[in-house]
Amino acid sequence: SIAKHQSKTTIGAHNIFLGQVRADAIDSKTVSAIEYTAYEDMANAKFYEIREATFEKFNLTCMHIYHSLGKVNTGEICLFVFVSSPRRKEVFKALEYVVEEIKAKAPVFGKEIFEDTTHQWKVNI
């Protein structure tokens, strides 16, 4: 669907955020993956609310949000956010806003899995 944006001639800028799972060291253990779970209906409803609030706050033409579910290994992408606008400053501000809203409000839960197979629930900061 992103390729279709070429025909939208009022768009002057696109911005993309790719969230990637890091191999964080926590208490002498290294993260090897994060297993994401969600109440999908609730998460989709929250993504919709965030999307609509972002369209109200910023002059955007288009937005796409995709969050992984299941096991995502370190180095792999877990979150994709794409925004389009007539102006570049809008896409920079909007993208930061949307990512922070997702991190703070979306009911998506991450279980950090360590190399030794132990785990802990991730705290978003």
Tell where the protein language model's regions lie, with residue ranges:
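N-terminal, polar/charged subdomain of small-to-medium soluble alpha/beta proteins
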Residues: 1-77, 86, 92-125
